[in-house]
From Swiss-Prot:
Organism: Cryptococcus neoformans var. grubii serotype A (strain H99 / ATCC 208821 / CBS 10515 / FGSC 9487)
GO molecular function: 1,4-alpha-glucan branching enzyme activity; cation binding; hydrolase activity, hydrolyzing O-glycosyl compounds
Keywords: Cytoplasm, Glycogen biosynthesis, Glycosyltransferase, Transferase
Protein name (database record): 1,4-alpha-glucan-branching enzyme
Binding site for (1,4-alpha-D-glucosyl)n: 88, 124
Length: 682
């Protein structure tokens, strides 16, 4: 047996002895992390200092009003700062180059305290590259870029330095709520209203934040904040890593939004894209200094065939500075509380997960197919964040099931707090597309909801933005389809399709919430069964906003049945707030009955009885429960306020009998109506 050590990366063997055959790979990974960390300690004064690159690179205004500008561009032979401030002069502000390839210039104040570059004016760096060609680029550390589609789709870099009276002053610090028990509301500012246009930061703050709070979520995951030239990329083709998207408003307005969220007690996560970058040259960081390999790998290794984007060289010192400082920037300047890391599977493997089914065999997670440099970057990122921000939350989007992903770096893990349970939404879509209700296997559903790694927390969700994208559709639309157009009014008949859709939509969300993980996620609009799908304005749809919005008005119209799904979301989130099942050990499942289509489990002192049978209700249905006593109804999806049929007596009492049943010490008998969940508690 390998001796378990906390200092060589094999500490994870304590929680998973099956990793024993791969202890060599774990040691190698941890040694690579320690080596990179040692280099940073020796040359940069430590990881904390190294990750503050945003304080020295890009534009820095000194106390006298002068501006120092630094840019890493080793391939350039000459460089100069140009902009509206110097009438785009190529001679007024030349830059000098350090031995490490960093260009620098200082623009003195006009007079003491008066900045020479006007606030929000346009700026660029102009470089001469080998061969004599002159190229213009937007500074990589720029904090604001804007787009005027009447002139060009290419972004303009802007020098953001508002006067003191226009700078937003935070009233609240980072969230200090525990990392556990997250109920995450995944949101995209631009689509966050029923209007056929881009919604603003201010509108989101005023109109949407109170909804999120009322719904009972305690965390927001904000998509598409990092600037992206192509709106239809959903924010995943980032061009400017330090710029908050100007489509939605100004940097100060985003700060105000985050501050208001903190006032409401919400944790705010940024959907960070460090897995790849837009291949845009004129307004991105591709071919920045004329070379193919500045921030990225050269040639094929630096390109993602499916995403048509560039791939970072995580082994390069300056790339590490750029990415680690990017995380620190969003934490410090905008007060985000953590990150959902996009595309982690693509980062961790040289094959980027393409063509790999991932059977779960441990050999798939170690060896030549793993990108060790990317793994080290993720370990450095998590170490830096958790060492400097005690309440930070990091979530990995990984489909592969990488062991140790959510164990601390000190043990030899990768250091994330959570992973997304990406197999769960896939299961629901497959069931709804390919199987009739009486073909659903209860054992299959339970397995998918509980098949997660011991002591590695996961975020469960029935659907996210991925399922809503064009080509797919929301769960509600899979369930009810075109009948949603004609029969979602209380004044219209309750058709069998709508009745089934409302019932299953509640049950699917609730069983995922209660059985599926240690955190729960919902994509905005799905809490009330948003119809159709997501599709951003683009050439292929006549630049239409029809599907790039969230129709909250459907809930506000009290004649429509969407209110029932919304109210159930409120009830289940606030019930979790009271009983805290997300922060409890995994549920004990005592029954998966294929014939009856019934699932029974206990978690956080509650007894959950799900009857998925399309037609069969059961009288005096016997279920096992461990704790004896008098049980009462805590919640049922069949209540009238949730669009149910009111078949359960809310004042009913259920007494246990001290006799073993389904592996539990006691049993009680209930009435279990079809397509209904019943929650009992002492």
């Amino acid at each position: 047996m390998t001796a378990v050590s906390l200092s060589d990366g094999t500490g994870v063997l304590k929680t998973d002895p099956w990793l024993e055959p791969f202890s060599g790979a774990l040691r190698e990974r941890y040694a690579a992390y320690q080596k990179q960390r040692t280099i940073i300690e020796e040359h940069e004064g430590g990881l904390a200092e190294f990750s503050k690159g945003y304080k020295s690179m890009g534009f820095q205004v000194d106390k006298n009003g002068g501006v120092r500008y630094r840019e890493w561009a080793p391939n350039a032979t000459e460089a100069r700062l140009i902009g509206e401030f110097n009438n785009w002069s190529h001679t007024a502000n030349p830059m000098t180059k350090s031995p490490f390839g960093v260009w620098e210039c200082y623009v003195p104040p006009v007079s003491p305290g008066v900045c020479p570059i006007p606030h929000d004016s346009m700026v660029k760096i102009s470089m001469t590259i080998p061969g004599g060609e002159s190229i213009d680029r937007i500074p990589t550390w720029i904090t604001r870029v804007t787009q005027d589609l009447n002139i060009s789709p290419v972004y303009d870099g802007r020098f953001w330095n508002p006067p003191k009276d226009q700078q937003y002053r935070f009233k609240h610090g980072h969230s200090t709520r525990p990392v556990e028990g997250l109920k995450i509301y995944e949101a995209h500012v631009g689509i966050s209203s029923p209007n056929m246009r881009v919604t603003t930061y201010k509108e989101f703050e005023v109109d949407v934040l109170p909804k999120i709070k009322q719904l009972g979520y305690n965390c927001i995951q904000m998509m598409a904040i990092m600037e992206h030239a192509y709106y239809a990329s959903f924010g995943y083709q980032v061009t400017n890593f330090f710029a908050a998207s100007s489509r939605f408003g100004t940097p100060e307005e985003l700060k105000s939004l985050v501050d208001k969220a903190h006032e409401l007690g919400l944790t705010v996560l940024l959907d960070v894209v460090h897995s790849h970058a837009s291949k845009n040259i004129l307004d991105g960081i591709n071919m920045y200094d004329g070379s193919d390999h500045l921030y990225f790998h050269e040639g094929g290794r630096g390109r993602h065939d499916q995403w048509d984007s560039r791939l970072f060289n995580y082994g390069h010192h300056e790339v590490l500075r750029f990415l680690l400082s990017n995380l620190r920037f969003w934490m410090d300047i905008y007060m985000f509380d953590g990150f959902r890391f996009d595309g982690v599977t693509s980062m961790m493997y040289k094959h980027h997960g393409i063509g790999s089914g991932f059977s779960g065999g441990y050999h798939e997670y170690f060896g030549d197919s793993v990108d060790l440099e990317a793994m080290v970057y993720l370990m450095l990122a998590n170490a830096m964040l958790h060492e400097n921000y005690p309440h930070v939350v990091t979530i990995a989007e990984d489909v592969s099931g990488m062991p140790t992903l959510c164990r601390p770096v000190a043990e030899g893990g990768v250091g994330f707090d959570y992973r997304l349970s990406m197999a769960i939404p896939d299961m629901w879509i497959k069931l709804l597309k390919e199987y009739t209700d009486d073909q659903w296997e209860m054992g299959h559903i339970v397995h998918n909801l509980t098949n997660r790694r011991h002591l590695e927390k996961s975020v469960a969700y029935a659907e996210s933005h991925d399922q809503a994208l064009v080509g797919d559709k929301t769960l509600a639309f899979w369930l009810m389809d075109k009948e949603m157009y004609d029969f979602m009014s209380d004044l219209s008949p309750l058709t069998p399709i709508i009745d089934r859709g409302l019932a299953l939509h509640k049950m699917i969300r609730f069983i995922v919430h209660t059985l599926g993980g240690e955190a729960y996620l919902n994509f905005e609009g799905n809490e009330f069964g948003h119809p159709e799908w997501m599709d951003f304005p683009r050439e292929g749809n006549g630049n239409s906003f029809a599907h790039a919005r969230r129709q909250f008005n459907l809930v506000d119209d009290k004649l429509l049945r969407y209110k029932y799904l919304y109210e159930f979301d409120v009830a289940m989130n606030w019930l979790e707030d009271k009983y805290k099942w997300l922060n409890s050990p995994q549920a004990y499942v005592s029954l998966k009955h294929e014939g009856d289509k019934v699932i029974v489990f206990e978690r956080a002192g509650l007894l959950f009885i799900f009857n998925f049978h399309p037609t069969q209700s059961f009288t005096d249905y016997r279920v096992g429960v461990d704790t004896a006593g008098e049980y009462k109804v805590i919640l049922t999806s069949d209540e009238t306020r949730f669009g149910g049929h009111n078949r359960i007596d809310m004042g009913g009492r259920y007494f246990t009998t001290p006799m073993e049943w389904n592996g539990r010490k006691n049993w009680l008998q209930v009435y279990s109506p079809s397509r209904t969940v019943l929650v009992l508690g002492l």
